[in-house]
C-alpha cells in the first residue's frame, strides 16, 4: 500500500505546485483578454498618459505655447485610453462594446476630420495633470491642487460646480438617432460615495422621462463619461422638435451638487429651424484660414456644436468669385483681398467641414451670385453682353457702364479707389450655366452642402442692348431677376441647399418664388426695412421684425437675420475698441432676443480663431461686429459667452413655441408694474424705456413676448458703445393683461389654468414655471387673461396652452414603469438613488406658483413607489396645489379611473414616439387615436428584473417619467402605447416613497443604461403602421391574459395639469415577455428567477386639487398600454407568435447560465462596480425607503404603476427585424447561451451601424471627393460621414473584450485555455509519477 500511495509531504508539494501553475495561467489569460480589449477599444478615445514623464513633457510644451494657444488647449476635451481602462487592476467600470459605445461622430477613425472632443493627442496630454499617477478606471480624474479640465461646451450651471462639462454628440439629430450625453462630473463632497447624474427630458411643459448614470467616487474625485454611458434612445423624440434636458448631479443622500440645462433638437431638415453660425479667417493671421490654427477652430466648433448650431456659413474661403474652391491647390492666395493678402489652406477648410458634418450640421459655401473679381488679373469669363449696366451713376460706377464695386485701398499714405468686382445680369442664361457649374464643382471639392449667396444690394440696371437708353421702361431692378436666377440654379444643383442675401429684406416679396431653401437677410439701420414710424427716431432692435412679418405673411420659410453689433467705424464703439473693451453683453442679447421673439434667428456666433475672442474669457466664440466678419475689434467676455450659450439652449428647447408656424396676434396685450402703471407703450418696440409687449399664437397655444427696454434706448446696433447703457432695469411682479376676444369664458378659464413663464436669463435658465392667472372681462364682456409674471430681466416668454382637456383625459392616468431599486447598501455601485431619495430635495422647494425659476414649473408634482425588484422603486404621487382651479381636472379623473381601454392607452400613448412601435427611422410614431388598442396587454413587470445590464459602478437609467400635459402637443402628441400593469407572478408589495421633482420615476438599468421609462408625452406624427405592429406584438404576448384587471386612476399632472392630452411619451418603458425573450439567453434566464413585484398605490394629497394617483391592481392588462424599450430586439416588426414557444425554451434552457453568471456580478460589486445583469436577484431585496411627506412641488401627473421594463441597448436600432434571429431554437441550448449573448450583442452593434447610415448627414463624408453631395437637400435622406465607416463592422469581436473583470478569467471552451489545462495536466501527471518513483525507491 505504501508503494502505491504518495506520502503526505509529496501530496502537499503537488497541490502547491498545481495552485501556482493555475494562478499563473489565469493571470496570463486575463492579461491576454485585457490586451484584446485594448486592441478593439473605442477608436474615439484619446491616449491620456498618466505617467510622470508625460506630465513633465506636457508642462514643457505649455511653456512654449502662446497665451492664445493655451486658452484653446483648455477648451479641448479628452477621452482616456481604452487600453488604460482594460488593464487597470482596479478599474471601476467595464468597457462597452465599441460598436455600441462610439457615437456616430467619433466612430470612424479613418475620417479626415476629427472633433476637439477626441482629436489631437498633443493637446489631450495637457489634461494629464488632472489624472492621478495610477488610473482608477476610464475617465476617472483625481482632484489636484491646480486642476485643469478640458471642456467641450460652455457650462452654465444653475447651482454648484459638480458638473465640469456637459456635451452631446451632435448639434442636431436626425429622426431615429440616439442622443449620447457626456457629463464630466466630480464628487464635491468630503466623503466617498455614489454620485449620480440625472437627465430629465422635457418637451415644453411635459416631462417625458428621466435617465441616469451612477459612479462610485472618492471625495474630490472626478469622472469623464465614456461614449454610451448616458444615452437617450431615439424613440424618446419626435422629428422637428426641440427638447430641454435638465441635468443634475446628486450624492448618495440625494443632495443636489449641480444643475445644468441643455437643449436637444431632432430635425430631419435644418431649414425648419436654422441656427446659423460663422466660420471665417483669423484676424490674427491677416484674415487667413490656415492649418496652423486647426486646433483653435476645432475647439470653437465643438463648443458651437454644444450651443446647437446646426448650420455654418463659411465666409470668404473662396479663391475668386468665378473659381471658388479649386481641387488642385493645397493653399491659395486671395488676390482680390488687396487690403490683407489673406490665404486659405484647403485641407483646413475640409477638416472643419467634416467636423461640422460629424456634429449633425451642414456647411454652406459663401460666394457672390453675380460677381467676378476684376483685380486678380483674370480675364472676364463671359462676354460683355452678359453684364448688368448702370441706369445712373449712384454708387456702382458710371451710367451705361457695367455695374461694379470699388473699395478704397491705402497706398503711399493715401487711399486709392480699386475696383474689385463686376456684376452679371441675373437673367443671363450663359451666366446661370457658368456659375452653377463652377459652384457645383467647388461644393464638391470642399464637401459643402449648399451655397450661401450674397448680393451687393439692389440697383436699377439695363441689359447690354439697352445700356445707352434713357427709356425708364427698359430698366429693371436686379432683385426682379433674383427669383428667375434662383430657380435656374436649383434646377441645375438640386442636391445642394441654396439661399441668397436680400439686403435689408427690401424686395423680399420678389423672392417668394425663388425656390430657395431658407430666407436670409442682412439687416441695416436704414432703408425700407424700417417701418415708417422710425423716421424720426434712431434705429432699434426691431429692424428685423418688419422683415420677419413679411416672411410670415408670405407663408415662407424661417428667416435668418444677420445684424452686426457695434462695429468700430466711428462713435463710442470705436473708442471702446481702441480702449480694448468688450462688447456690451445685454446689447447683444437684446438683439438676439428681439429677433428670436419675432420668429427668426440672429446669426451672430462665429468661429474665427481670433485672440480677441479668447483673452477676456470668451472661449473663442466670437460675435459678428461688422460686415467683414474676420474683423473683431471688441472682445467677447466670459459673461457674454456664457449667456449666449443660455440663449442658444433656450431658442433650441422652445423652437416649436417661438417659430413653428407661429403668427402675430393682433389682440391687445399690455404690461403693468406692481403699482398698476402701464409699462408697454407700443407693440413695435420703436421707443425705449418700456416693456416691449406683443402676443403670438400657434397651434393650440399662445405666447406673450416681453422684452425689457426699461431705462435704455432702442438702438439695436449700439454704435455708441459703452457710452450708452444697454442694461435695462430689472422688473418684478409684473401683470400682463391679454384680451382674448371671442374666446368663451370656459375656454378662457382653461387657458388660465395652463399658463407658464420661462426665460433664458439667469433667474430662470429655460425652466418653465407655472404662474397664477385669472380671467376678467372688459367693457364688452369679453374675457381678459390677467397673468402674474414674477421677474423680467431681458426677455420672458409667457406660454399659454389652450388645448381642450376633455380631448385628452389620459394625461392624468398614465402609469409609471418600474423604478430602479434603491438598495444601494446591498449593491453600492448599482444605479444610484432613484426618485424616492430625490424627494428629499424636492420637499424643501417652494410651491409651483411661486416665482422661483427652478424646476418648479416643469417638474411639478411627480411621484412613484418603490418595488422590491432590483432597480425598481416608485414613490407616491403628491398633489399640485396650483392645479386646484383646473376646470377639467375632475372630469379627467373620472375618465381616467374608468376601465375603458382607450383611456388607458391614451394615458401612456404619449411616451416615446417611436420606441413602442419600432418604426423605421423615417417613420413617424403612432397617433393617440391608434393608442386606443384594448389588446395591448403585455405584462411588463416580469420583464424588468433582468434589465440590469449596467457595467460595474456605472449605470444609466432612463427613468420612467409621466409626462405632463401641454397645449400644443395635446393635439399632436401621438405616441405608442405605454407599459401595462405587472403580472401577478412578477409583483410583490412595496412601501411607497416620496419622489424627486425632476427624477421622480422608477429606473431600470440596462447595459450601462438604466431604463427609467418616461411617462412622457412627446407630440408625434400619426403612424398607423407602428400602432398595428405594437398591437400585434402585445396581443401575442404569452402571459398577457394572466394579468388581472387593474384600473388606472387619474393623477395630478405636471405643469399642464388641466390639459392631460399629451403626456404619455413613455421613453424606454416596460416590455412584454416577447420583448424580454428577444434579449440574450443569460438575461432571459435571469428574468425567470427574479422576485415578483407588486405595485402599491400612489396617492395624491386630497387638498392638492389634483386627481388621484393610480392604484395597483386596478388596471386590466388587456386595456393597459405597453411600451417597448428601445432595444434592437424590441424593434422587430415581425410577428412574434411563431417564436413564442422557442423563446420560452430559451428562457428555461439558459437559466443555469444566468445563475452561473450571477456570481460574476457579486464579484463586480465587491470591486466597487455597478450591478451587472446577473446581479439582479442578489439586489432584489429593496431598501425600504422612508415614506416622505408629499411635496406640492412634486410631479404627480407623471405617476404610473410599478412596471419593470427592459433596458435600452446602447445604439439600439429602430427598425431591424433581423434581430429576431436570436430567438431561434438553435440558440436555446444552455451550453451555447454565452455565445448567443455575444452574438446578439455583436448583431446589435452591426445593425445599429446600418441604421445610423440611413439617418445621418452628410452623405459619405469620409470620402473627401464625395463629402457635401447629399442625395437631396433634405438632410434626413443623406448618409452620415463618420458613423457609417465600414471598418466599424469589423468590431463585433470587441464585445468579448468588454466584459467585466470576472469574465477575464479562463473560460471553458476557449481553445487556449483548453491547451493550457492539458499541458498542466500532463505536467501534474509527470510530477506525480516522478515523486511516486522516488518514494518507491
Curated annotation (Swiss-Prot):
Its EC number is 3.2.1.11. It is an enzyme of class 3 (hydrolase). The keyword Signal applies. It is found in: Secreted, Cell wall. InterPro entries: Glyco_hydro_66, Glyco_hydro_b, Ig-like_fold, LPXTG_anchor. Residues 1094-1121, 1140-1151, 1231-1266 have a biased composition (Basic and acidic residues). A motif (LPXTG sorting signal) lies at residues 1305-1309. It is a peptidoglycan-anchor. The modification Pentaglycyl murein peptidoglycan amidated threonine is found at residue 1308. Optimum pH is 5.3. Keywords: Cell wall, Glycosidase, Hydrolase, Peptidoglycan-anchor, Plasmid, Repeat, Secreted, Signal. The keyword Repeat applies. Its main location: secreted. Residues 1309-1337 form a propeptide. One of its GO terms (molecular function) is dextranase activity. Residues 102-118, 845-881, 898-915, 977-992, 1127-1139, 1293-1303 have a biased composition (Low complexity). Optimum temperature is 39 degrees Celsius. Residues 1-30 form the signal peptide. Belongs to the glycosyl hydrolase 66 family. May play a role in sucrose-independent adherence to the pellicle-coated tooth surface. Homodimer. This is Dextranase. It comes from Streptococcus downei. The lineage of its organism: Bacteria, Bacillati, Bacillota, Bacilli, Lactobacillales.
Amino acid at each position: 500500500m505504501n508503494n502505491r500511495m504518495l506520502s503526505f509531504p509529496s501530496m502537499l508539494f503537488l497541490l502547491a505546485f498545481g495552485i501556482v501553475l493555475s494562478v499563473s495561467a489565469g493571470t496570463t489569460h486575463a492579461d491576454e483578454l485585457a490586451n484584446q480589449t485594448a486592441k478593439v477599444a473605442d477608436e474615439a478615445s484619446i491616449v491620456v498618459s498618466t505617467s510622470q514623464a508625460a506630465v513633465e513633457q506636457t508642462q514643457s510644451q505649455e511653456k512654449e505655447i502662446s497665451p492664445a494657444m493655451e486658452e484653446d488647449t483648455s477648451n479641448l476635451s479628452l477621452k482616456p485610453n481604452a487600453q488604460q481602462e482594460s488593464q487597470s487592476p482596479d478599474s471601476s467600470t467595464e468597457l462597452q462594446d465599441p460598436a455600441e459605445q462610439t457615437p456616430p461622430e467619433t466612430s470612424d477613425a479613418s475620417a479626415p476630420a476629427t472633433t476637439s472632443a477626441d482629436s489631437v493627442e498633443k493637446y489631450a496630454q495637457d489634461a494629464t495633470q488632472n489624472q492621478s499617477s495610477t488610473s482608477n478606471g476610464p475617465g476617472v480624474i483625481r482632484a489636484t491642487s491646480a486642476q485643469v479640465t478640458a471642456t467641450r461646451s460652455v457650462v452654465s450651471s444653475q447651482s454648484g460646480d459638480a458638473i465640469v462639462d456637459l456635451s452631446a454628440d451632435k448639434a442636431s439629430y436626425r429622426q431615429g438617432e440616439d442622443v449620447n450625453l457626456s457629463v464630466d462630473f466630480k464628487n464635491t463632497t468630503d466623503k466617498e460615495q455614489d454620485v449620480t447624474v440625472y437627465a430629465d427630458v422635457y418637451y415644453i411643459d411635459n416631462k417625458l422621462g428621466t435617465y441616469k448614470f451612477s459612479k462610485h467616487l472618492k471625495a474630490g474625485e472626478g469622472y469623464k463619461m465614456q461614449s454610451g454611458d448616458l444615452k437617450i434612445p431615439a424613440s424618446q423624440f419626435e422629428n422637428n422638435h426641440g427638447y430641454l434636458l435638465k441635468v443634475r448631479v446628486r450624492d448618495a443622500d440625494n443632495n443636489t451638487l449641480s444643475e445644468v440645462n441643455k437643449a436637444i433638437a431632432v430635425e430631419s431638415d435644418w431649414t425648419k429651424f436654422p441656427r446659423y453660425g460663422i466660420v471665417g479667417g483669423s484676424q490674427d493671421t491677416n484674415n487667413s484660414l490656415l492649418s496652423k490654427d486647426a486646433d483653435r477652430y476645432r475647439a470653437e466648433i465643438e463648443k458651437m456644436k454644444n450651443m446647437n448650431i446646426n448650420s455654418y456659413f463659411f465666409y470668404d474661403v473662396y479663391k475668386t468669385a468665378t473659381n471658388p474652391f479649386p481641387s488642385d491647390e493645397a493653399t491659395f492666395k486671395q488676390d482680390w483681398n488687396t487690403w490683407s493678402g489673406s490665404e486659405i489652406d484647403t485641407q483646413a477648410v475640409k477638416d472643419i467641414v467634416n467636423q461640422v458634418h460629424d456634429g449633425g450640421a451642414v456647411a454652406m459655401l459663401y460666394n457672390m451670385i453675380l460677381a467676378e473679381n476684376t483685380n486678380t488679373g483674370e480675364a472676364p469669363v463671359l462676354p460683355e453682353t452678359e453684364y448688368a449696366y448702370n441706369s445712373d451713376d449712384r454708387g456702382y460706377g458710371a451710367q451705361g457702364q457695367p455695374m461694379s464695386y470699388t473699395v478704397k485701398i491705402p497706398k503711399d499714405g493715401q487711399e486709392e479707389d480699386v475696383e474689385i468686382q463686376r456684376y452679371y445680369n441675373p437673367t443671363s442664361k450663359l451666366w446661370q450655366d457658368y456659375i452653377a457649374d463652377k459652384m457645383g464643382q467647388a461644393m464638391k471639392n470642399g464637401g459643402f452642402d449648399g451655397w450661401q449667396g450674397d448680393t451687393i444690394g439692389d440697383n436699377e440696371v439695363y441689359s447690354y442692348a439697352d445700356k445707352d437708353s434713357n427709356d425708364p421702361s427698359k430698366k429693371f431692378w436686379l432683385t426682379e431677376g433674383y427669383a428667375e436666377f434662383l430657380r435656374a440654379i436649383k434646377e441645375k444643383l438640386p442636391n445642394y441647399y441654396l439661399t441668397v442675401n436680400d439686403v435689408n429684406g427690401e424686395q423680399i416679396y420678389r423672392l417668394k418664388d425663388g425656390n430657395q431653401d431658407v430666407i436670409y437677410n442682412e439687416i441695416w439701420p436704414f432703408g425700407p426695412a424700417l417701418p415708417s414710424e422710425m423716421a424720426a427716431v434712431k434705429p432699434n432692435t426691431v429692424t428685423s421684425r418688419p422683415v420677419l412679418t413679411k416672411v410670415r405673411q408670405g407663408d415662407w420659410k424661417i428667416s435668418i437675420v444677420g445684424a452686426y453689433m457695434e462695429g468700430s467705424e466711428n462713435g463710442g464703439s470705436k473708442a471702446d475698441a481702441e480702449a480694448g473693451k468688450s462688447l456690451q453683453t445685454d446689447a447683444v442679447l437684446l438683439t438676439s432676443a428681439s429677433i428670436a421673439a419675432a420668429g427668426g434667428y440672429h446669426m451672430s456666433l462665429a468661429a474665427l480663431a481670433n485672440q480677441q475672442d479668447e483673452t477676456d474669457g470668451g472661449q473663442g466664440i466670437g460675435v459678428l461686429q461688422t460686415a467683414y466678419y474676420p474683423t473683431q475689434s471688441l472682445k467677447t467676455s466670459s459673461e457674454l459667452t456664457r449667456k449666449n450659450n443660455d440663449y442658444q439652449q433656450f431658442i433650441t428647447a422652445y423652437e416649436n413655441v417661438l417659430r413653428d408656424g407661429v403668427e402675430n396676434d393682433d389682440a391687445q396685450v399690455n404690461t403693468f408694474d406692481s403699482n398698476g402703471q402701464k409699462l408697454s407703450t407700443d407693440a413695435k418696440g420703436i421707443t425705449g424705456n418700456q416693456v416691449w409687449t406683443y402676443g403670438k399664437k400657434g397651434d393650440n397655444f399662445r405666447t406673450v413676448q416681453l422684452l425689457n427696454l426699461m431705462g435704455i434706448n432702442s438702438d439695436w446696433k449700439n454704435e455708441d458703445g459703452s457710452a450708452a447703457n444697454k442694461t435695462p432695469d430689472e422688473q418684478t411682479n409684473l401683470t400682463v393683461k391679454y384680451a382674448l376676444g371671442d374666446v368663451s369664458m370656459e375656454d378662457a378659464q382653461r387657458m388660465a389654468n395652463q399658463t407658464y413663464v420661462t426665460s433664458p436669463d439667469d433667474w430662470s435658465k429655460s425652466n418653465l414655471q407655472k404662474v397664477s392667472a385669472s380671467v376678467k372681462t372688459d367693457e364688452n364682456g369679453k374675457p381678459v387673461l390677467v397673468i402674474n409674471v414674477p421677474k423680467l430681466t431681458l426677455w420672458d416668454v409667457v406660454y399659454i396652452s389652450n388645448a381642450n382637456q376633455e380631448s385628452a383625459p389620459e394625461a392624468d392616468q398614465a402609469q409609471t414603469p418600474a423604478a430602479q431599486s434603491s438598495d444601494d447598501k446591498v449593491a453600492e455601485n448599482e444605479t444610484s438613488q432613484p426618485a424616492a431619495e430625490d424627494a428629499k430635495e424636492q420637499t424643501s422647494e417652494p410651491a409651483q406658483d411661486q416665482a422661483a425659476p427652478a424646476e418648479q414649473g416643469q417638474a411639478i408634482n411627480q411621484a412613484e413607489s418603490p418595488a422590491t425588484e432590483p432597480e425598481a422603486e416608485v414613490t407616491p404621487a403628491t398633489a399640485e396645489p396650483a392645479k386646484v382651479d383646473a376646470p377639467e381636472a375632475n372630469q379627467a379623473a373620472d375618465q381616467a379611473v374608468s376601465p375603458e381601454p382607450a383611456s388607458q392607452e391614451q394615458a401612456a400613448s404619449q411616451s416615446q414616439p417611436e420606441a413602442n412601435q419600432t418604426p423605421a427611422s423615417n417613420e413617424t410614431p403612432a397617433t393617440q387615436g391608434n393608442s386606443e388598442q384594448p389588446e395591448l396587454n403585455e405584462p411588463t413587470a416580469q420583464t424588468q428584473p433582468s434589465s440590469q445590464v449596467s457595467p460595474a459602478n456605472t449605470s444609466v437609467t432612463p427613468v420612467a417619467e409621466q409626462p405632463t400635459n401641454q397645449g400644443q402637443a395635446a393635439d399632436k402628441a401621438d405616441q405608442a402605447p405605454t407599459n401595462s400593469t405587472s403580472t401577478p407572478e412578477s409583483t410583490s408589495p412595496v412601501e411607497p416613497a416620496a419622489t424627486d421633482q425632476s427624477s421622480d420615476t422608477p429606473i431600470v438599468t440596462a447595459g450601462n443604461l438604466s431604463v427609467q421609462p418616461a411617462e412622457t408625452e412627446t407630440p408625434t406624427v400619426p403612424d398607423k403602421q407602428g400602432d398595428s405592429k405594437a398591437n400585434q406584438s402585445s396581443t401575442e404576448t404569452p402571459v398577457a391574459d394572466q394579468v388581472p384587471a387593474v384600473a388606472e386612476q387619474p393623477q395630478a399632472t405636471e405643469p399642464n395639469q388641466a390639459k392631460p392630452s399629451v403626456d404619455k411619451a413613455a421613453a424606454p418603458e416596460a416590455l412584454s415577455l416577447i420583448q424580454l425573450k428577444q434579449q440574450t439567453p443569460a438575461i432571459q434566464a435571469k428574468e425567470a428567477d427574479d422576485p415578483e413585484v407588486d405595485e402599491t398605490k400612489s396617492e395624491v394629497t386630497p387638498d392638492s386639487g389634483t386627481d388621484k394617483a393610480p392604484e395597483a391592481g386596478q388596471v386590466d392588462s388587456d386595456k393597459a398600454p405597453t411600451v417597448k424599450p428601445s432595444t434592437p430586439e424590441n424593434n422587430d416588426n415581425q410577428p412574434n407568435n411563431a417564436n413564442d414557444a422557442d423563446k420560452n425554451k430559451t428562457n428555461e434552457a439558459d437559466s443555469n447560465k444566468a445563475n452561473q453568471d450571477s456570481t460574476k456580478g457579486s464579484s463586480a460589486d465587491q470591486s466597487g462596480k455597478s450591478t451587472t445583469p446577473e446581479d439582479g436577484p442578489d439586489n432584489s431585496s429593496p431598501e425600504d425607503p422612508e415614506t416622505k411627506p408629499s411635496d406640492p412641488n412634486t410631479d404627480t401627473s407623471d405617476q404610473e404603476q410599478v412596471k419593470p421594463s427592459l433596458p435600452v441597448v446602447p445604439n439600439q436600432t429602430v427598425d431591424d427585424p433581423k434581430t429576431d434571429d436570436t430567438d431561434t431554437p438553435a440558440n436555446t441550448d444552455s451550453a451555447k447561451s454565452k455565445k448567443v449573448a455575444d452574438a446578439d450583442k455583436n448583431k446589435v452593434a452591426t445593425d445599429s451601424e446600418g441604421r445610423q447610415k440611413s439617418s445621418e448627414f452628410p452623405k459619405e463624408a469620409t470620402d473627401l471627393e464625395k463629402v457635401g453631395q447629399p442625395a437631396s437637400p433634405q438632410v434626413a435622406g443623406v448618409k452620415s460621414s463618420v458613423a457609417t465607416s465600414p471598418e466599424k463592422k469589423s468590431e463585433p469581436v470587441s464585445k468579448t473584450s468588454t466584459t467585466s473583470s470576472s469574465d477575464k478569467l479562463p473560460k471553458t471552451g476557449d481553445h487556449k485555455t483548453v491547451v493550457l489545462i492539458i499541458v498542466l495536466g500532463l505536467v501534474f501527471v509527470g510530477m506525480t509519477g516522478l515523486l511516486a518513483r522516488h518514494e518507491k525507491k
